[in-house]
Amino acid sequence: LGTPTEAEERTYSAGGEAVGYYAGWAAYQGFTPDQIPAEHLTQINYAFAQIDPDTLTIALENPAHDQKNLAALRKLRQQNQHLKLLISVGGWSDSQYFSDAAATAARRESFAASCVDFVVEQGLDGVDLDWEYPVSGGAAGTIHRPADKQNFTLLLQELREQMDRQGRRDGKDYSLTIAGAAG
């Protein structure tokens, strides 16, 4: 997110987006969600949820700690009604099972359903996928397949469809974003 001083110096044009990631481990270093200059942001992505290797569904690495942070972020959103809160899945250290979760239609459906359930249960506004990286690269131990590129697109499609269905049920417009490599 940068330091509060850096954030205070920035201005954003009407209609623009200012997205920040809040890393769950930042609280261990004394930077808690209530210190985020939310008035300067339109969206906060909570980093990171992971993919459970056994069920290939969304999971929190440290549920008690993460739940506390998510509660603090929801409180911050109450004080900043313009703010969207998303769960970010993956990142450098937790992308190893994306390829497995995206490999088949059944797995994509299950993973997407778990994300939608998580968003609804946690009172969030959407999901950010941070798969580092489809096909090749990323941290040691990350699983890759040649079909990752196509499967990632299909995973995004499945997740978007399930989020839209949920949105029609509860009258909300859920966001789906990705963190992608450039170049």
PLM ranges: what are they?
Residues 149-183:
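Aromatic-lined carbohydrate-recognition surfaces of secreted/lumenal glycan-active proteins
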Residues 90, 132-134, 179-183:
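An acidic- and aromatic-residue-enriched active-site/binding cleft used to recognize and process polar
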Residues 2-9:
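Boundary at the C-terminal end of the N-terminal hydrophobic targeting segment
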Residues 10-119, 135-136, 143-158:
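Glycan-recognition patch characteristic of GH18 chitinases/ENGases
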Residues 83-85, 127, 172-176:
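Residue-level recognition of the N-termini of beta-strands and the immediately preceding loop/turn
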Residues 44, 127-129:
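Hydrophobic residues within beta-strands of alpha/beta enzymes
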